[in-house]
Amino acid sequence: RVTYGGGRYHFDDDQETPDTGMASFDFGHCTAMWDQSSCNRRRSETPPFVSFYGEGGVLTTNTGQNYTLYDLDGKELERKSLPTSDAPHFANFVNAIRNGEKLNSEIGDAQVSTLLCHLANMAWRTDGAVDFDPAKRRLIGNPAAAKLWARDYRPGWEPRV
C-alpha cells in the first residue's frame, strides 16, 4: 500500500508533482517513508540527501558513492567519500546498447524504484492511497489510479513488444 499527503504549496504552475509531501510505502514486512520539500527556503543543516533508518543504525548519503553509517546512539561507525560523476553510468548504458556490455545496474532494479515514485504520484493525484499487487504487477481497487497506469499513444507511435 502506498499513501501520499502533500501538495503544490510554493509555485502555482503546471508541474504534475507536489513540491512538499510525504509518501509511505507499506511492504507488509517493513515500511519506507519518503519526506520531501523541494521549495522550502530553509535547508537542512546537514548535507544528507537520503537517510535509511534500520534496526541496527542509520545510513545517510548524499550521492551514490558517499555515505556515513551511525549506530543507534548516533556514533559514527564508518564514512566513505569518493568523487562522484554520472559519466561512467551513462557510458555503461550506451555501451550496453551499442556493444552488449553488461549493465552495472540491471534495468529491472531501476524499474522497481521508479515504480515506487509513480505509485506515490498516483496516490497523490487520486484519493491519497494506492494498493498494488507486486506479484501480478497490478493496481487494486482504485479506478482513478488505473487511468494513470498507461498513456494513450498517438496512432503509429504505440509500443510494440
PLM regions: where:
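Contiguous beta-strand/loop segments that form the cofactor/metal-binding neighborhood of enzyme cores
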Residues: R1-N66, K75-G108, T114-V161
